[in-house]
């Protein structure tokens, strides 16, 4: 997910996207632990997407305060 796409989301959308990404990260970690994950680079991209969304949430909360 690109930073521009995250910035277009509202606060509720960002929080919903964060939950989706955290669930995906959990599934990927479990697949990696059991040796079923083919694209291990996906772990890195999901982790970075989570960071982007969390940053956007912080910025949006500070803007509303």
From Swiss-Prot:
UniProt entry tagged with the keyword Hydrolase: no
A GO CC term assigned to this protein in UniProt: ribosome
One GO-annotated biological process of the protein: translation
Pfam families referenced in this protein's UniProt entry, alphabetically: Ribosomal_L29
UniProt KW S-adenosyl-L-methionine keyword: no
Keywords of the record: Ribonucleoprotein, Ribosomal protein
Domain of life: Bacteria
SUPFAM superfamilies: Ribosomal protein L29 (L29p)
GO molecular function: structural constituent of ribosome
InterPro entries for the chain: Ribosomal_uL29, Ribosomal_uL29_CS, Ribosomal_uL29_sf
CDD domains documented for this protein: Ribosomal_L29_HIP
NCBIfam families, A to Z: L29
Recorded family membership: Belongs to the universal ribosomal protein uL29 family.
Stated name of the protein: Large ribosomal subunit protein uL29
Protein species of origin: Acidithiobacillus ferrooxidans (strain ATCC 23270 / DSM 14882 / CIP 104768 / NCIMB 8455)
């Amino acid at each position: 997910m690109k930073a521009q796409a995250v910035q277009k989301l509202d606060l509720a959308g960002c929080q919903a996207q964060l939950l989706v990404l955290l669930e995906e990260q959990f599934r990927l970690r479990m697949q990696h632990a059991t040796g079923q994950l083919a694209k291990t680079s996906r772990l890195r991209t999901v982790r970075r997407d989570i960071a982007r969304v969390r940053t956007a949430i912080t910025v949006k909360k500070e803007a509303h305060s």
